[in-house]
Amino acid sequence: MRSRDIRRKYGQNYLTDKSVLFKMADAISPTSSDNFLEIGPGLGALTEQINKDDINIIAIDIDSENTEILKNKFTGPANFQFLTDDILKYKIENDRQRIVGNLPYNISTQIILKLIDSCENCLLYTSPSPRD
């Protein structure tokens, strides 16, 4: 995985601990034809863990450099979309999604509140946030 500087203005925190990634992927347990919305995919560590041929992933990152890295890293599957967007402004179209991510610390509460308002039938899987 290509490393790059973390941009604090975006609240970036790249999840790199393999044991945490494996535990998250095990808990998420992707199944055939799942629809995922990944918030803040960063460099794709979690994306790589849940990657299966028959799932659909929309990965949204506010950082265009991350989006370009992901587009180059995951070149095969047509069922992946990598978007540069602000999740707080993004319109969630499908409320039957499994939402995953290592949420940006500085807006994690706002993201969760948006999801509560936008998604009646979504399942959220996220990494733990540090204590304030």
PLM segments and residue spans:
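Catalytic cores of RNA-modifying enzymes
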Residues: M1-S127, R131
